[in-house]
Amino acid sequence: MRIELATEPGDPQHPNEDYASVALPASGQGGVLVLLDGVTPPPYEVGCTHPVPWYTARLGGAMLELSGSFRDMTLPEALSAAISRTAEVHRSTCDLSHARTPQATAVAARWSPDTVEYLVLSDSVLLVEHHDGTVRPVLDTRLDELPPAVKALRETVRGLPRGSAERAAAAREYTAAVEALRNAEGGFFTAAADPAVAARAVTGSLPRAEVRSLTALSDGASRWVEVFREGSWADCAAVVHKEGPQGLVDRVRALEAADPDGTAFPRGKSRDDATVVLVAP
């Protein structure tokens, strides 16, 4: 079995908001991977005293334990229970009803001798490589399917000079429009304090015999495909296999450095936390 992971903050001066871990049972039969991408908080009060890395560490740890130790639980059930457990830790001190209480995107996979199960919530990615070499991305595309009016606001922001007052004003309008769709019908979903959100995840299972490898990516790593258009998902998986997870992160960093202002490749952050997990069970 091959297990490798790499994670790197977008800004060395700020904590990494991603979480990644892999657990193997003592029996050696099967395993679990969990990757979370913490949602960077806005620059205003969100009703919680805890930083995003605090949240992702606790949610990720709970998800890893529950999905690995209780194999009778489905992955959505494990995520739901992990969200509930994490919420209880700070319910008495924080306003968990706030729309921007700490939250994260999620990828999880669990394998046994017979089956590979998977879960994806929001814009992190799981790549499933089959033995014939084909690679299938498991994607939750709801964040890409925003209403046309919201997409138009995003393009307006990207078309204005960075640092300008006009861009800042347009960005505030765009952000407000996106926030109105967060964890709402017709919008997109992230793991925050509502355990019911787990049922919104993209899930499925495959025969273990069909799966050669699994690669989980936070969106800071998947931008190699989605933002910089350096290759297909199959190309991305090939880079990870050949150069390791750190190799993909290094490639992304080089692309970001070549376009620091996002002129050629518009994106929300010039650099983002980037995490890659490779498992070849």
Which functions belong to the PLM regions below?
Residues M1-P281:
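PP2C/PPM-type serine/threonine phosphatase catalytic domain
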